[in-house]
């Protein structure tokens, strides 16, 4: 099963995350199938590749709780319903 989850980057006390598609059996820092976005909680900046995210969701990928909240904030699920 494929999951959409966050992969941690950055230094101590300065985390940044990439939103990735990864096999659920792999560890958090394992090799990603595809990088789908970027999240910086300090600056509160988010960049998403919406088309690829929708493609993975339609093919059965499950987002983690945090990724679900990020996608919901950017109305990705509403865009998915329109297509």
From Swiss-Prot:
Gene3D superfamilies: 3.30.1320.10. SUPFAM superfamilies: Ribosomal protein S16. One of its GO terms (biological process) is mitochondrial translation. The keyword Chloroplast applies. InterPro entries: Ribosomal_bS16 (IPR000307), Ribosomal_bS16_CS (IPR020592), Ribosomal_bS16_dom_sf (IPR023803). GO terms for cellular component: chloroplast; mitochondrion; small ribosomal subunit. One of its GO terms (molecular function) is structural constituent of ribosome. Transmembrane segments: none annotated. Keywords: Chloroplast, Plastid, Ribonucleoprotein, Ribosomal protein. The keyword Heme does not apply. It holds the Pfam family Ribosomal_S16. It is found in: Plastid, Chloroplast. Belongs to the bacterial ribosomal protein bS16 family. This is Small ribosomal subunit protein bS16c. It comes from Chaetosphaeridium globosum (Charophycean green alga).
